[in-house]
Swiss-Prot record:
Protein's cellular compartments: Cytoplasm
Organism taxonomic ancestry: Bacteria, Pseudomonadati, Pseudomonadota, Gammaproteobacteria, Moraxellales
Reaction(s) this enzyme catalyzes, per UniProt: guanosine(2445) in 23S rRNA + S-adenosyl-L-methionine = N(2)-methylguanosine(2445) in 23S rRNA + S-adenosyl-L-homocysteine + H(+); guanosine(2069) in 23S rRNA + S-adenosyl-L-methionine = N(2)-methylguanosine(2069) in 23S rRNA + S-adenosyl-L-homocysteine + H(+)
Enzyme Commission code(s) on record: 2.1.1.173, 2.1.1.264
The encoding gene: rlmL
SMART domains the record matches: THUMP
Protein name per Swiss-Prot or TrEMBL: Ribosomal RNA large subunit methyltransferase K/L
UniProt key word Metal-binding: no
InterPro entries linked: 23SrRNA_methyltr_KL (IPR017244), DNA_methylase_N6_adenine_CS (IPR002052), RlmKL-like_Mtase (IPR000241), RlmKL-like_Mtase_CS (IPR053943), RlmL_1st (IPR054170), SAM-dep_methyl-trfase (IPR019614), SAM-dependent_MTases_sf (IPR029063), THUMP_dom (IPR004114)
Main location, first listed in the record: cytoplasm
Family as reported in the entry's similarity comment: Belongs to the methyltransferase superfamily. RlmKL family.
Keywords, in A-Z order: Cytoplasm, Methyltransferase, RNA-binding, rRNA processing, S-adenosyl-L-methionine, Transferase
Residue span(s) of domain THUMP: 68-183
Keyword Cytoplasm listed: yes
Length: 776
């Protein structure tokens, strides 16, 4: 059988000089790393001037000197362990494998590796194709080492399985067995700076590997300044990305903290203490010099931004920065409590004045295990992309974006150009790192891009002319108010009874059921002409048009799922006044966003800062989102439907709002019962009830004309003395109860809440501002 002995012999007691030792010993090393990090580790080793070969998952082979060994242990940010090959031997798996391992271990002179006074432990990895008791095989390797020492000293070193001075690693497959000595000691990922923790932290060497993958280590073409001028982590947790990025920039040897007593080679017979101390001194000098330059010339330090919605995470980050020896840089960093929804407000001025000319945005969002609610993960990742696109819109800057996720589908929705994906592990969790340049956000929408032109369509010319006339007028108003979701046609012509609403780049077309006097084939022909006209006027394809037939509603039809529809179950994103909102064009009669209440939501937003807000009949919580984005101190959304509240939660997450925060409550309950039993007071209350409801979830029915007075009276009991209640409804024949006007100060604000795209002479809704009557 073939045997290979990897370590050249050397006289241990002589402690050779630094130069001699590095020349005498030729070491066959295996550098281990977490699965998936082989390429970043190889990049790092190459930067050290050390050639390597990827042998298998998580293992790189290096043939090097003692200096190379020390350099990897001292400087590698990605490696997990450094194993030195002691001996390798071919085996026959059909024979007694445990005894073959004994023979292999017995052929090694262990007294040349460590002394009698030191403890050791055995670690064994066995291929599943090999039939052997792992425990017994480890025992036989231990026996071989003990027998070797007994033959020389008539005594043997002790075994310490928990905290040994040396760990002997053995690997066995169906053809070969190998013995290694662990010279790194404790895992190299431990830096020593993690004194404060947050939930599910990122391992240090994984963070470093991802920074390598994203190119943080690169310099500009001249080689004298960093390639990136800023690093932004919008959900920094305990600050691992920030700290690892700073340690890279400041030329910090991450093994310095372990240099006191934690390396496995300290008691090794071939350890060269003089060479090691020389390398430690050099590393410390380099770090001090880099810190001095950063403090004296702050412009040489990239801008560093670390944000988290959890103040505890920010405190942890600052503590860890100090523990990492970076306390002198704290005044130069922007580490603050800031929720994701506030990110764009900070970034836009920095982009505008050129301070973010080439940033790296890298983060580890609270995916899966950290977030806890799977339904919130997709909106969270979408919100990151949307907020960043908004922040860099029109700047000409293409930032690098790198984001971790627990499932690759989560990062598939990120707007990244030519994305790369790294599959790796954060501890036991498989994660995916998606990185690449951010795709610039689309500018404009169907309204803003509309240009009037000559279009000739037989039998449909009147419709096209009216639609273009409407759009010519609406385009100017939409641009003035920055509106992209509007109604552009509402049965203006008797022969074309449709309503056309635009949501960004999509057309939502509702066909009113024709009267019985119109033959079905005539109605169908006219509707098809309208669809053709819509495509011609907007220059859009069939996939951008969604069709519904609208008949007289009864009960809860407005909120019920539709039957024979196309493209079911897909949500699209509409933007309104700085908010992102999910809309569904197929599954329900309504889309999830009532565009006729656009001005009402703006009014609520303008009055919500530092206020407590209650949204009754909250539906998909669009008004609640606006209140939260405006800085409301608390927002409570109440609706009978849990499904719509879940939709509302996703709207919150889509805007970077933390639905787990105590600031935001989502309550599935009967409105009348809830406001009767709840005693909390609110500064702003919004009520937009259905015209009629007969839901099975509560007894009886709700009729807005019949029941609005009782509803408002109960709600006013929950309104603070100087608060405002906004009441709105879409019942065309609605009349406000006179007793309410006698009891409260009420202002009809319908004219102010009807948008420019709706007919004020035939208001689609009525709205009122209601306050407590003040005593004189």
């Amino acid at each position: 059988m073939t045997e290979t002995t990897a370590l050249a012999s050397s006289t241990a007691s002589s402690q050779p000089s630094s130069q001699a030792s590095s020349q005498v010993l030729s070491l066959d090393l295996i550098i281990t790393c977490a699965d998936g990090l082989e390429a970043p580790l190889q990049t790092e080793l190459t930067s050290f001037g050390i050639a390597s070969e990827i042998k298998s998952t998580g293992r790189l082979a290096v043939t090097g000197t003692l200096r190379d060994l020390y350099k990897i242990c001292l400087w590698s940010r990605v490696a997990s362990r450094v194993l030195m090959l002691i001996k390798r031997k071919n085996i026959n798996a059909e024979y007694d494998v445990a005894e073959q391992l004994y023979g292999l271990a017995k052929s090694v002179n262990w007294t040349e590796q460590f002394s009698l006074e030191q403890t050791f432990a055995i670690r064994l990895s066995v291929d599943k194709r090999v039939a052997v008791s792992q425990q017994f095989a480890m025992l036989r390797i231990k026996d071989a080492i003990a027998d070797t020492f007994n033959e020389v000293y008539e005594s043997r070193p002790n075994v310490d399985s928990k905290n040994p001075d040396f760990s002997v690693f053995a690997t066995v497959n169906d053809k070969q067995a190998e013995l290694y000595l662990d010279l790194s000691g404790t895992s190299l990922h431990r830096r020593g700076y993690r004194v404060a923790m947050t939930e599910a932290p990122l391992k240090e060497n994984l963070a470093a590997a991802l920074l390598y993958s994203a190119g943080w280590h690169k310099k500009n073409e001249a080689g004298d300044t960093p390639f990136y001028n800023a690093l932004i982590d919008p959900m920094c947790g305990s600050g691992t990305f920030i700290i690892e990025a700073l340690l890279m920039h400041c030329d910090y040897a991450v093994g310095i903290d372990k240099a006191a007593n934690q390396f496995g080679f300290y008691e090794w017979q071939h350890h060269d203490a003089a060479l090691w101390q020389e390398m430690i001194d050099d590393a410390q000098t380099r770090f001090r010099a880099a810190l001095e330059i950063a403090n004296e010339q702050p412009d040489t330090l990239p801008l560093i931004f670390g944000f988290d919605a959890d103040n505890g995470a920010i405190i942890a980050t600052e503590k860890n920065l100090i523990a990492a020896g970076l306390q002198d840089l704290l005044p130069l960093l922007d580490i603050e409590t800031r929720a994701l929804d506030q990110l764009s407000t900070l970034l836009k001025p920095l982009v505008a004045d050129g301070r973010l000319s080439n940033p790296l945005i890298i983060t580890n969002p609270p995916y899966g295990e950290r977030l806890g609610d799977e339904e919130m993960i997709k909106p969270l990742y979408q919100s990151i992309g949307l907020i960043l696109q908004d922040s860099f819109a029109g700047s000409g800057i293409d930032p690098m974006l790198g984001i971790l996720a627990s499932h690759v589908e989560q990062v598939d929705i990120l707007p990244i150009r030519e994305p790369k994906t790294l599959r790796c592990h954060n501890g036991a969790i498989t994660v995916y790192f998606r990185y690449g340049t951010l795709i610039a956000g689309q500018t404009g929408n169907l309204v803003s891009r509309f240009e009037k032109r000559e279009i000739e369509v037989e039998d449909g010319q009147d419709f096209i002319n009216r639609l273009q006339k409407n759009l010519t007028r609406l385009k100017k108003l939409a641009k003035k108010d920055n509106v992209s979701n509007i109604r552009v046609y509402n049965a203006d012509l008797p022969d074309f009874k449709v309503a056309i609403d635009l949501y960004g780049d999509y057309a939502h077309v509702q066909e009113y059921a024709p009267p019985k006097t119109i033959p079905p084939e005539t109605a169908k022909k006219r509707f098809n002409l309208a669809l053709m006209g819509i495509r011609e006027v907007f220059g859009i394809n069939r996939e951008q048009i969604f069709i519904k037939t609208r008949a007289r509603q009864s009960g809860n039809d407005q909120y019920s799922k539709q039957g024979n529809t196309e493209k079911r179950g897909k949500f699209y994103i509409a933007r309104e006044d700085g908010a992102y909102l999910y809309v569904n064009f197929t599954d329900y009669l309504d889309t999830g966003l009532f565009i006729d209440h656009r001005n009402m939501r703006a009014r609520i937003k303008d009055n919500s800062r530092n206020k407590s807000v209650l949204n009754l009949f909250a539906y998909t919580c669009t008004a609640s989102v606006h209140a939260a984005l405006a800085g409301a101190k608390k927002v409570t959304s109440v609706d009978l439907s849990q499904n719509y509240l879940d939709w509302g939660k996703q709207n919150f997450a889509l805007n970077g709002l933390n639905v787990s925060s105590n600031k935001y409550q989502f309550v599935a309950a009967d409105i009348f019962e809830w406001i009767k039993d709840n005693t909390e007071q609110f500064d702003i209350i919004f009520i937009d009830p259905p015209t009629f409801s007969n839901s099975k979830k509560f007894q009886g029915t709700f009729d807005v004309q019949r029941d609005h007075a009782a509803l408002i009276n109960r709600a006013m009991n929950r309104l603070t003395a100087d608060g405002i209640l906004y009441f709105s409804n879409n019942f065309t024949r609605f009349e406000l109860d006179e007793q309410l006007t006698e009891r409260y100060d009420i202002i009809d604000i319908t004219q102010k809440t009807i948008g420019f795209d709706f007919d004020i002479k035939k208001p689609i809704h009525q709205s009122f501002e209601i306050r407590h009557r003040q005593s004189l």
